[in-house]
Amino acid sequence: MTHPFLFLKWLVEHFTQGTSLENLEHYGFLVHVTHAWLIMLLLTGVALLLKRRLSEVPGGLQNLVEIVLVELGRLADETMGPKGRRYFPLIATLALFILFSNLIALIPGFAPPTANLNTNAALALAVFGMTHVVGVREHGLKYFKHFVGPVWWLAPLILPIEIIGHLARPLSLALRLFGNMYGHEIVLVIFFTLVPLLLPIPMMLMGILVAFIQTFVFTLLAMIYIAGALEEAH
């Protein structure tokens, strides 16, 4: 998707003596990858800053982060149970990265990494891989017994269904997030191009809602998949 203006595009062209970002993309300098690294650096910087300034009486940013993490931890406990607490860092990292990747779309001149299918596919594959790692860690090789079902003579029928169902998970995670964020990005670009003042404001407010909803849906589904792997194999 062509943006009317990208801050990083201007920055690259300025410091590379007019080399366009489209030419640099052939060398791996992709817009969504650059913005994804920007989000990761931002989150890392905020985490290090909070670590240095931790206080028993939280205030400001620390208070906000604690509220978000406590509520997210409560949701994780309700969804995954006590065994799922060891996987909370993964869930929290996914939630924060996706949320900030969605919200950066509301800043003129920046493109959301989650509006690119490659970014979402990487996140979805990470959840997919971790789900089965959790299953094997908790149940050993017995984890794979649920792929063939409880009755052996139904295995030829159950096995393909289970495989298709599990492969559909990362596909649905990636496409759902991509479709919603890419569609919202198109609408924002159209409104900013046609009517750059006042009218895009309601769309930006809706964008905040979309960013939080999509973060919640992706994170909740990730927790549900991990919770399924944590359950006793049948």
UniProtKB/Swiss-Prot annotation:
A GO term, aspect molecular function: proton-transporting ATP synthase activity, rotational mechanism
One BP annotation, GO: proton motive force-driven plasma membrane ATP synthesis
4Fe-4S as UniProt keyword: no
Broad class of where this protein is predominantly found: membrane
InterPro entries on file: ATP_syn_F0_a_bact/chloroplast (IPR045082), ATP_synth_F0_asu (IPR000568), ATP_synth_F0_asu_AS (IPR023011), F0_ATP_A_sf (IPR035908)
Membrane topology term: Multi-pass membrane protein
Gene Ontology CC annotations of this record: plasma membrane; proton-transporting ATP synthase complex
Subcellular location per the Swiss-Prot or TrEMBL entry: Cell inner membrane
Pfam family, one: ATP-synt_A
CDD domains for this protein: ATP-synt_Fo_a_6
Gene3D superfamilies: ATP synthase, F0 complex, subunit A
Keywords per UniProt: ATP synthesis, Cell inner membrane, Cell membrane, CF(0), Hydrogen ion transport, Ion transport, Membrane, Transmembrane, Transmembrane helix, Transport
Membrane-spanning parts: 29-49, 90-110, 116-136, 147-167, 186-206, 207-227
Subunit composition and interactions: F-type ATPases have 2 components, CF(1) - the catalytic core - and CF(0) - the membrane proton channel. CF(1) has five subunits: alpha(3), beta(3), gamma(1), delta(1), epsilon(1). CF(0) has three main subunits: a(1), b(2) and c(9-12). The alpha and beta chains form an alternating ring which encloses part of the gamma chain. CF(1) is attached to CF(0) by a central stalk formed by the gamma and epsilon chains, while a peripheral stalk is formed by the delta and b chains.
Function: Key component of the proton channel; it plays a direct role in the translocation of protons across the membrane.
UniProt similarity note: Belongs to the ATPase A chain family.
Name this polypeptide is given: ATP synthase subunit a 1
Species in which this protein is naturally found: Syntrophotalea carbinolica (strain DSM 2380 / NBRC 103641 / GraBd1)
